[in-house]
Amino acid sequence: MKEKTNDPASPREVGSVRLGGITGRVAHPAAPGEALAGGPQMVEVSRDGKRIYVTNSLYGSWDDQFYPDGVGSWFAKIDTDPAAGGGLTVDEKFFPRGDDFRGRRVHQVRLGGGDASSDSYCYPS
């Protein structure tokens, strides 16, 4: 995942993190020995822009096609600081995965109280 400035006259990268993947399968810092299948598929940004929530399952049939040995389930949080100009950091303490989801695949993040960007239309600013 990459973060770029929002200045169209002067775009530049201000942050980058890697998790999972088809070939690299980059591990989460909380479990460095555990190669992650899948990559961030569903992305939700907190309403204040300081947290990015990502999950790894897109659609079951596609997951099975691209990851025949299994995609598993994982959910990660990436922190950013818009006031400081950006930058991305994987939250090392937040990493539900595998058995935390009782065999289910994790697809989309829906947070009560409207913390995610897709909930913005439900709550007054």
Question: What label would you give each PLM region?
Answer:
Residues 1-125:
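Feature marking well-ordered beta-strand scaffolds used for ligand recognition
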